[in-house]
Amino acid sequence: MRELFMYLFLLFLVLCVKSVYSTPTREQFQNCLSTKQFNSTLKNPINLTTHTLDSRVHTDFSESSSPNSSFLNLNFTSLKPILIVKPKSESEIKQSILCSRKLGVQVRTMSGGHDYEGLSYLSLSPFIIVDLVNLRSISINLTDETAWIQSGATLGEVYYKIAKTSKIHAFAAGICPSVGVGGHISGGGFGTIMRKYGLASDNVVDARLMDVNGKTLDRKTMGEDLFWALRGGGAASFGVVLSWKVKLARVPEKVTCFISQHPMGPSMNKLVHRWQSIGSELDEDLFIRVIIDNSLEGNQRKVKSTFQTLFLGGIDRLIPLMNQKFPELGLRSQDCSEMSWIESIMFFNWRSGQPLEILLNRDLRFEDQYFKAKSDYVQKPVPENVFEEVTKRFLEQDTPLMIFEPLGGKISKISETESPYPHRRGNLYNIQYMVKWKVNEVEEMNKHVRWMRSLHDYMTPYVSKSPRGAYLNYRDLDLGSTKGINTSFEDARKWGETYFKGNFKRLGLVKGKIDPTNFFRNEQSIPPLF
């Protein structure tokens, strides 16, 4: 009898513990969203779009690391989201935050789903996804040359709206049309006119954020410290950015683009080496990036370098400038094409001549591919022999990639403490490393990831040091990750200072004020510092 009593008592304890710590179900979350407490601000609670779990997306989440099988998370196994929330109003975002707090689940906010490690749609802990796809309005004011952009908009949607409104305006941001504005801006935002106008985050003049209590703040009510943190510090650590107000950039009606491709070899190595010394020092109107990749010619792999260029002016200005600063490239007028700024976006996406409406396609991503990426900053020209070794290593892979993005210009004129993005003066260019593959198997993944890590290790002597810099928007969990809600600030320094250098401490202090319980967190979020 005593044994039976003990058994029943232990069973009771187990059931109690299970009830306390069990993961909330989809139905529980829906019930929370449907209660009067959370629906008081809605005119018609029955029509809540938050009660959706897209079956296609849900299936893909269970089979891969992203909604479109384009991104790979290498460092942790994801749980399926309890719910994919697709709010149609800001009040529904508030409901999602409050219910998540009540039920003890994390919130992952997804703007475009391009986080390189999947942190906008993956988690080790029980979580929901707040997909901002329905909140993507764009309001342009040409009088003061600004735009209010909701975080669910993609860069392609923003560019299309600008182009339909003005022939002489642009926005200083990236070239990938399907990238979401929310994450891109909050991580910095490289682009083809950044040497003239700075990063996307440098052009933010106001923002609206929903905090952990569901309160909406703008620049005035959030204060300058939090506004500073959002512009390059990764907004997902602080709340849900609802919208950004950005400065538009003036561009000429006609810009000039050209592509110059060459097989890698001694002469090409000299060209790339020469570019390193001048890319960041050229006229601010001139952006020349270098892409190193390979292709199959017959049964043989060939490594090539491509100089991809945008000039904010005509051919008649560009040719003399190139002859003076970079005559080694041998640029001719017939190599160049004049076009509108919006056409240059198509050009950089290898889609010249296609309808502009393709920019509105939110699914323009790598097709059926997985990848691993890393980044670096170069402060002194890399020796020529390094490119010889890179060429040898590229011949081992089907789809390796290195992209050199020139810095300098406006980027270097901004203090490294003016925003969380610190990689300013003294940096010649950024390197993005990437390797892609199609077979979704562990052995295949490990083979390519080992290759990527080996290349990154090889480059160690030639890139920035103390700390070795990295770019947040090319997120890399190899740098380190948090250990849940109780991760110490000191533990996070290893990767935090890699992205933010000395700004990491200030980000922690801001986090401690706006989100002291660390509700908004992921595997590389900012821990609170008090």
From Swiss-Prot:
Tissue specificity annotation: Accumulates in cell walls of etiolated hypocotyls.
Q: Identify the domain of life.
A: Eukaryota
The disulfides recorded in the entry are 32-99
What is known about its processing and modification? The FAD cofactor is bound via a bicovalent 6-S-cysteinyl, 8alpha-N1-histidyl FAD linkage.
Indicate the transmembrane segments per the record.
none
User: Which residue range or ranges hold the FAD-binding PCMH-type domain?
Assistant: 77-251
- Answer yes or no on keyword Membrane: no
Pfam families on file? BBE (PF08031), FAD_binding_4 (PF01565)
Q: Where is this cross-link: 6-(S-cysteinyl)-8alpha-(pros-histidyl)-FAD (His-Cys)?
A: 114-176
Q: Where in the cell is it found?
A: Secreted, Cell wall
Glycan-modified residues: 39, 47, 68, 75, 141, 486
Q: Which parts of the chain are coiled coil?
A: none
GO MF term list = FAD binding; oxidoreductase activity
InterPro entries hit by this protein? BBE, FAD-bd_PCMH, FAD-bd_PCMH-like_sf, FAD-bd_PCMH_sub1, FAD-bd_PCMH_sub2, Oxid_FAD_bind_N, Oxy_OxRdtase_FAD_BS
| Keyword Hydrolase (UniProt) | no
- Tell me the PANTHER family matching this sequence: OS08G0158400 PROTEIN (PTHR32448)
Q: Which family does it belong to?
A: Belongs to the oxygen-dependent FAD-linked oxidoreductase family.
Query: This chain belongs to which protein, by name?
Result: Berberine bridge enzyme-like 22
